[in-house]
């Protein structure tokens, strides 16, 4: 099995840079798995988990909370560009749970006030918090 280079880039810089045998991401069209030699493409990512099976240890999987963005597959180089991304080991679950509660309160307030913009922001914040909790518990 071949290997790929996987990089995740955010406005804060490179958040992840490793060799991988397999990558799984959530795109707007559904889940997409990528192996070495995959057809070149660019796809839009949803808020979701990114699974990276490393080449240095067949059983080692890195989980990353990705908050949307794009993925580019070009030969055996995978680049993800996202507003933010956080590895499983770096997630503070209690902080993410507090963010979830805050987003739920904001969503309820927005629905009561019938404020669509506020509701959309709260919904995204809730999705991000849930994603971070899910990834942090792997």
UniProtKB/Swiss-Prot annotation:
Membrane topology field: Peripheral membrane protein
Cystine pairings recorded for this chain: none
Alphabetical UniProt keywords: ATP synthesis, Cell membrane, CF(1), Hydrogen ion transport, Ion transport, Membrane, Transport
Superkingdom in the source lineage: Bacteria
Listed GO CC annotations: plasma membrane; proton-transporting ATP synthase complex
Assembly and oligomerization: F-type ATPases have 2 components, CF(1) - the catalytic core - and CF(0) - the membrane proton channel. CF(1) has five subunits: alpha(3), beta(3), gamma(1), delta(1), epsilon(1). CF(0) has three main subunits: a, b and c.
Entry function: Produces ATP from ADP in the presence of a proton gradient across the membrane.
Record-stated family: Belongs to the ATPase epsilon chain family.
PANTHER family per the UniProt record, alphabetical: ATP SYNTHASE DELTA/EPSILON CHAIN (PTHR13822), ATP SYNTHASE EPSILON CHAIN, CHLOROPLASTIC (PTHR13822:SF10)
Record's protein name: ATP synthase epsilon chain
Source species: Streptococcus suis (strain 05ZYH33)
Lineage: Bacteria, Bacillati, Bacillota, Bacilli, Lactobacillales
């Amino acid at each position: 099995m071949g290997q790929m280079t996987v990089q995740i880039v955010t406005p804060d810089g490179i958040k992840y840079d490793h060799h991988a045998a397999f990558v799984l991401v959530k795109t707007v069209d559904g889940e997409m798995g990528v192996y070495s030699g995959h057809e070149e493409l660019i796809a839009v990512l949803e808020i979701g988990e990114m699974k990276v099976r490393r080449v240095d240890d067949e059983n080692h999987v890195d989980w990353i909370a990705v908050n949307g963005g794009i993925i580019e597959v070009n030969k055996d180089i995978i680049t993800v560009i996202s507003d933010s991304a956080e590895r499983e080991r770096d997630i503070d679950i209690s902080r993410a749970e507090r963010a979830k509660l805050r987003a739920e309160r904001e969503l309820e307030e927005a629905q009561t006030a019938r404020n669509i913009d506020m509701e959309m922001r709260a919904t995204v914040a809730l999705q991000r918090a849930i994603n971070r909790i899910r990834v942090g518990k792997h």
